[in-house]
Amino acid sequence: MNLKYSRIILLAIFLFPIFIFSQKAKYASFATARVLKTNANAITRNSTTEITIEAVDKIVIHKKRVITVLNKLGIADAPMSIGYDNDTKITKLSAKIYDAFGKEIKKYKKRDFLDVSAVEHGTLYSDDRIKYLRYTPTNYPYTVVFETTYKTNSTAFIPRWFPINGYYISVEKSEYILKNPLNLPIRTLKNNFENYPVEDTSSPFNLHYVLKNQAAIKAESNSLSYLDLMPSLFVSLNNFSLKGVKGFASNWEEFGKWMHQKLLTENTQLKTSTKLEIKSLVKNAHTDLEKAKIIYEYMQRKTRYIGVQIGIGGWKPIPANEVDNVGYGDCKGLTNYMKALLDVVGIESYHTLVYAKRNRNIIKNFPSLQGNHMILNIPNNGNDIWLECTSQTIPFGFLGDFTDDRDVLVVTPEGGVIKHTPKYINHKNSQETIATIKLTSSGNLSAAVERTSKGIKYDKKYHLDKKSKKNLENYYTSKVWNYNNNTEINHITLLNNKETTSFKETIQLSITNYVTSYQENMLFKINVFNRFKKIPKRYRNRQNPLKINRGFIDRDISTITLPEGYSITSLPKEKKIENKFGLYHIQFERINEKTIKYRRTLSLKKGIYPKEDYALFRKYCKLIAKYDNLRIELTKK
């Protein structure tokens, strides 16, 4: 008996160091394959998302992420934070930090996490909060083990799976598990799985996906979003719950009906005095469009944007009467208020869900709770009018790049309808510049510039008339014309024409020492006010398609008076480049011996092009930049 126990003790003594070493090696950075470190700032060593659907209104989510951070740029790939609200109960929250050799150097429990409000600027009240750790590394690499478990009653949002979180992060293993013991009907949407070695062992009611040994992907300029290139999984229940409100939807029609009935009805009541005021405002208007414009401008004057996101209020608008009384609301509340005002005069309009900012579509073939913003749709007999209700300054019917050119969900009493917002593409995004320039024999320049912008170019400008004189001057000298040294702005006049959706800038300025002396002669760059500077990065082996996000057209005319005692022997020849990406055309004209005229047209076409076209596009951009820096010699008489 003693001999038996002695052998066990000896075996334990022998195995213990091996066990300790294996535990350390598990998180040691040297334990990863070399290929996973290539082009990587961080490595997903092991990421597990395990979801258990316990009921239509009860779901448990367990997540464990093991991330090795290789350098400073990889810190953002290893966040230790979790968002929650009154509908979420966090049952487990922990983190551990390991050094390069796999030795534990920090250990955090739930009580060690900071707990702060997730309220953004412009939000009055919200129940959204964040628990997070603030960790400052002293050495690289290091490994983070972050683990959470939480419960929620909202099953309208099943966690999605993005096995590759972005560029410059490799994946040793990423796993997604969904357990559905009640066999509730589920729908999935898989994107780009065919381009990656994703293992799928799912069954009709339970899901299991794994991605292993995926090398890091390098970002490329002028490319598609990583969401369009990398694998992703979307999951939704037909029967779901949102903040205590149950629903059913297997298509957009059903979803729209549910949203209209459960979240949007009975919220458009207004007091009698407001109704009378609205009717009085539009009494002389002849068309519904005129009435809608008058009411929209009334709404803009009366309200301002303030976020209101507590409970179902994150999705259900606050009543129109409340917005009318307090003068503020979030996107849902202000959109709903505008709809209520239009209802007073019998103009049909509908709440519309949209993904704002980044150009992203509501997914047509995956009915579910989507979008992060709400706008208003006026059908207008098939000529849709779209209203952004959170801005006090944007023109009637203009969306700008915040919500243009994307699929949206229009919620009607009969159900949801997918529509597409207006496109501001190519020639609709125009900028016309007319400059009168005078050069002096001392090398200085004075000019009067008129610039008119439309489309998305207008969208980038119309806020300028709210800037102070000092900030405006800094905007022109440090941003618009930062390539010109010694620029002094003498006078600025801005005109925002909301009727034509055009913005006009009239500027008088001077530039000291603009002209360069060259022996007895002088040299100057003829393109003073609109030089192209965006030359795409060179890639020896381009991997992804070329994407031009926005098309535009710029037209410039400069009339230049030469300095006394100088002339131009010969003007440069006309240059014209036309290809699938656009047009670049510059022309030179001698008006008389003291005056020349310079005309320039540059257009770019929105589109997605094969990766093989990237080199040609880069060459096009380089030629534009070259000719935009063209110098002309002034010869002394």
Predicted regions and their residues:
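A sensor for short, sequence-defined functional sites
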Residues: 23-637
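Bacterial Sec-dependent N-terminal signal peptides
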Residues: 1-26
